[in-house]
Amino acid sequence: MIIKPRIRGFICTTTHPVGCEANVKEQIAYTKAQGPIKNAPKRVLVVGASSGYGLSSRIAAAFGGGASTIGVFFEKEGTEKKPGTAGFYNAAAFEKLAREEGLYAKSLNGDAFSNEAKQKTIDLIKEDLGQVDMVVYSLASPVRKMPETGELIRSALKPIGETYTSTAVDTNKDVIIEASVEPATEEEIKDTVTVMGGEDWELWINALSDAGVLAEGCKTVAYSYIGTELTWPIYWDGALGKAKMDLDRAAKALNEKLGATGGSANVAVLKSVVTQASSAIPVMPLYIAMVFKKMREEGVHEGCMEQIYRMFSQRLYKEDGSAAEVDDMNRLRLDDWELREDIQQHCRELWPQITTENLKELTDYVEYKEEFLKLFGFGVEGVDYEADVNPAVETDFIQI
């Protein structure tokens, strides 16, 4: 079939398998061009490995460090009549390309929050790798099914205390609007922490540790975003921020646990990027369009792959073997360039000036839209979108 983009709200309901593969190839090419990561781990588990920072982590480990990788994710495969999710095609492409280079790559597809996912992953590690040297936790899900009760808990992207009103962009109509978001209830805050906090990360590490599949010196990292006062009301000071603070709590507990055998646990604070997750957060698309333009002008813009390569090579696995620089909460900070005072001051001054008329001129909004479509495999250079493609892609993913 010939597949065209169809947008509904914050998601594109169609995906292009060839475009998704081209995206993965692009990230691999970048990683190889940077050269090998000297002290990289050799056996890596990535939970949430099919898109965004998780996918880039798997690419950095495999193509930057020569690692054997296991990926866990929850994606829908395509049929001959209907495309699957972008993450499905990303993961399929990664496996194919890794194996072509003689790298071990296996994936498990299903609910990473479940006990079954943890058990099947442990079984696979025991069978194929023995142990792992690194665990990346990169889940971004709006819903968590509680393993013991089957209850579905949902997160809320809302402020705390009072209604938040701000200039935002309606990405469907490309117009500037006033967006208002009602505050979260106590219940919604609690639920957001349950879904997006550190509990499941702890459950994963504890299960892996109890099963004896964490190697001595194993490092684990989970991803977070803090941002600046421009986004704090909806993000860091909102329900989502409470969940991210819980991630810090979990990191502290896990760091003590893994530290006993020479390992470590850190939260890595990353910069804002165009992802399905960030596009759903009010205000983020406009902020991203502004900050990207300034960062590009300053020569410090990074996408997922650049960020993660820098995290591996300049933080966690430095060439000289020295310890990573961390902030006062023991976090790895990769948002350092985005938070530069000149860049933030530019955004603060620009924010009130943005109108529908000057949006495309004063910000990288056009590029934002292009990057958003790229997430789903559209608008990728060198892909023939008039060509007939088969959305049913063969994989040997292990079903959870």
Curated annotation (Swiss-Prot):
Molecular functions (GO terms): enoyl-[acyl-carrier-protein] reductase (NADH) activity; NAD binding; trans-2-enoyl-CoA reductase (NADH) activity
Reaction catalysis annotation: a 2,3-saturated acyl-[ACP] + NAD(+) = a (2E)-enoyl-[ACP] + NADH + H(+)
Coiled-coil annotated spans: none
Enzyme class: oxidoreductase
GO biological process: fatty acid biosynthetic process
HAMAP family to which the protein is assigned, alphabetical: FabV_reductase
Similarity field: Belongs to the TER reductase family.
Name of the protein in question: Enoyl-[acyl-carrier-protein] reductase [NADH] 1
Organism from which the protein derives: Vibrio parahaemolyticus serotype O3:K6 (strain RIMD 2210633)
